[in-house]
Design a protein with these regions (language model features):
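Flexible, low-complexity segments enriched for small/polar residues
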Residues: 2-23, 245, 249-433
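Hydrophobic residues in alpha-helical segments
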Residues: 29-30, 41-42, 96, 134, ...
Length: 433
């Protein structure tokens, strides 16, 4: 039998670097031990039977919005909503059903890192193209990812890059490129912001198609001075220059640590950056996932709404797009404050204890009630009543129940639906160990 410490470590691995266990998976991982579990969860998958065969979302270039008095306005708006719905549930299905969830988990992390919202972009195709870029590079090379992102139509539009000209510089993209995407706070100067904005001129987008075009005559072609280095740059070479700096290696390591290990105990082991020397994301994730800090009982972390919903859906064998009323999923994710493709700002979503509130607890109960109605409860209902509480912990990947939670669960021991509902809303499940 696994020790409590081993159980905690594996539970954290499964919930933080995946999206929680499928029925029976946690018990199997416990039997194999942490090293075997880490090898499974932290390795880059070569194939994924579901993801490799999933149909693509129905998204296309709709062209420009029709004039307000055009007869095409209604059909245009209807298709726009349908495309967003298709894209959203396509990704939720991938999160829930992918056999190797690390890639989707990291795609979700990078979506929050390069936070871009449909709220402003207002076209599904460029959001889809960005999402595919993030997925393609999610466990690849960060230099390549950054290069693709500074040439990404959705991000450029989101941060007003298309209005950045030599005569009228717009510094939004240049500032966030350094502060939020590659270097971090206090690792650049205001003069660096002004200079890097020049390197990002000349890029124009066709938003509905997600295409980016470079116009050399509209680009500042002279030398600029950035972080003490004078040279000529375009968007890609500027990105390479920033990512190559040691500050960038430390910053990305800090960000992954913050989201996967602890928001309360900042990174102090800077030796982890050596795993990121070549900007290999997979190597860094593997090093962080095997770090001893994963064992620290103090490093608990509240599940975000997406983490909670996706992990619950995996346990309950629910496919989001096949939910009887998919709008309920969208509405509850909105109420809980986290919906794919809608980060609140360029800084992305909050983390950890920011997700705890009286209102969120009420919405979570209501949402869980809907989920349980459509769940496969056989992993619990098939057990004898006196085995259900322990079986429930193994089903959901919970470390252990508190005496208070056990008492509540005991009261529902003969009602599998209520038992599942109580467990999904319990502190032990809402908080990742």
């Amino acid at each position: 039998m696994a020790t409590l410490a081993e159980r905690r470590r594996i539970a954290r691995l499964v919930h933080r670097f995946g999206f929680g266990p499928r029925p029976g998976e946690f018990s199997n991982l416990l039997a194999g031990g942490f090293n075997q579990a880490a090898e499974k969860y932290l390795s880059v998958p070569s194939q994924d039977a579901f993801a490799d065969n999933q149909d693509e979302p129905v998204v296309r270039d709709q062209g420009k919005r029709p004039a307000p008095n055009s007869p095409d306005v209604v059909s245009y708006a209807t298709e726009k909503r349908a495309q967003l719905t298709s894209l959203s549930f396509w990704w939720l299905d991938r999160m829930v059903l992918s056999e190797h969830s690390l890639r989707e988990r990291m795609t979700w992390f990078w979506h929050g890192h390069w936070a871009t919202s449909y709220q402003k972009v207002d076209d599904a195709l460029p959001m889809y193209l960005q999402n595919q870029s993030l997925r393609r590079n999610a466990l690849g090379n960060f230099a390549q990812m950054s290069r693709e992102m500074v040439n990404d139509a959705a991000l450029i539009f989101w941060l007003d890059g298309q209005t950045n000209t030599v005569k009228a510089p717009n510094e939004n993209l240049s500032r966030e490129l350094m502060e939020l995407f590659t270097l971090g706070v206090n690792r650049y100067s205001e003069e660096d912001v002004k200079e890097t904005a020049k390197a990002l001129t000349g890029y124009k987008i066709d938003k509905s198609s997600g295409q980016v075009n470079f116009y050399p005559k509209q680009h500042f072609s002279g030398a600029i001075k950035v972080l003490g280095t004078q040279s000529t740059f375009d968007a890609s070479s500027l990105s390479d220059f920033l990512v190559a700096r040691s500050d960038s290696a430390l910053f990305i390591t800090e960000r992954i640590w913050y989201r996967f290990i602890s928001t309360m105990n900042p990174l102090t082991d800077t030796s982890l950056t050596s795993s990121f020397a070549s900007r290999d994301i997979a190597a860094l994730v593997k090093a962080i996932g095997r770090h001893s800090a994963l064992d620290n009982p103090d490093n608990s972390m509240v599940k975000s709404p997406i983490d909670w919903f996706v992990s619950a859906s995996r346990a309950l064998s629910i496919t989001p797009s096949k939910f009887s009323n998919p709008n309920n999923i969208r509405n509850y994710l909105d109420l809980l404050g986290q919906r794919p493709f809608f980060p609140p700002n360029v800084g992305g979503w909050p983390a950890d204890q920011a997700w705890l509130s009286t209102s969120s607890a009420q919405y979570r109960i209501q949402f869980a009630t809907q989920l349980v109605k459509e769940a496969d409860l056989s992993p619990i209902s098939s057990l004898a009543p006196n085995a259900r509480i322990n079986g429930l912990a193994d089903w959901l990947g919970v470390v252990e129940w508190s005496s208070r939670t056990k008492m509540a669960l005991n009261g529902a021991i003969r009602d599998p639906a209520r038992l599942a509902l109580l467990a999904l809303c319990s502190p032990e499940y809402v908080v990742s160990a």
